[in-house]
């Protein structure tokens, strides 16, 4: 690809709140550390076939060229399945490869700036741990919130804990979809019942599994029993 040339964006217009909400049931966040040498694209394809409805590329150890290659591979997998694909934190990479959007944390680029760079059609998700952060993100134009960590997790050992009561308060305070993250697995999914979340975000419960397709199918079944619809 010629230097400075961007990929074609995913071929669709603005995602509505309901489009995004309906795609939040099982939100997969990648981490190759769990794959034991398996291909990330193959594992994501299996996960989508099993029931994953949204994919975030989060590979902090990857350099730019490797991350761009992974992003293009996952974009193709997700586009074929009609599943939204966003990139963690790296707004420039999301613009370069034509991802559906980006997910930013409280210490990352501001939501408004990410929107300015990626355009009005992009999905911009924001992490939040409190009602104040959630309301500020919604006011800034966030399309959805990732709230957690709900349980201790080896994926992000330094993550701020969010209680189930706080999760319920956040869901009740905003009108945009909320996905709960942090130690969510098939055994704990029932704890999300009544919280108001649109789904659960999962890392190791999918990518550490021997069979990503079967793990995703089980997670999707359990989450479908409890999420707000």
Q: What label would you give each PLM region?
A:
Residues 2-109, 116-143, 159-162, 169, ...:
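Conserved N-terminal beta1-alpha1 strand-loop-helix module at the mouth
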Residues 32, 150-153:
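A short, flexible beta-alpha/helix-coil linker loop
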Residues 108-111, 153-154:
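A short, polar/charged loop-to-alpha-helix boundary motif
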Residues 147, 179-184, 200-204:
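Glycine-rich beta-strand-to-loop/alpha-helix junction loops that act as flexible
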Residues 195-199:
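Internal alpha/beta core interface subdomains
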């Amino acid at each position: 690809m010629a230097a400075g040339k961007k990929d074609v964006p995913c071929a669709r217009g603005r995602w509505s709140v309901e489009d995004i909400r309906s795609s939040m049931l099982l939100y997969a966040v990648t981490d190759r550390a769990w794959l034991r040498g398996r291909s990330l694209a193959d594992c994501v394809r299996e996960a989508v076939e099993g029931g994953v409805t949204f994919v975030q590329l989060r590979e902090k150890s990857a350099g730019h060229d490797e991350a761009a290659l992974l992003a293009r591979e996952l974009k193709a997998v997700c586009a074929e399945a009609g599943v939204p694909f966003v990139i963690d934190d790296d707004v420039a990479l999301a613009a370069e490869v034509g991802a559906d959007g980006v997910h930013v944390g409280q210490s990352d680029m501001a939501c408004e700036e990410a929107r300015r760079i990626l355009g009005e059609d992009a999905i911009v998700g924001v992490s939040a741990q409190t009602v104040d952060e959630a309301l500020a993100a919604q006011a800034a134009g966030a399309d959805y919130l990732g709230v957690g960590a709900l349980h201790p997790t080896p994926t992000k050992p330094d993550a701020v804990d969010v209680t189930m009561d706080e999760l319920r308060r956040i869901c009740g305070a905003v009108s945009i979809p909320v996905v709960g993250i942090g130690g969510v697995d098939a055994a704990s999914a029932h704890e999300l019942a009544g919280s108001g979340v649109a789904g659960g975000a999962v890392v190791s419960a999918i990518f550490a599994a021997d069979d990503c397709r079967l793990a995703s199918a089980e997670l999707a079944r359990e989450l479908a029993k409890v999420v707000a619809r």
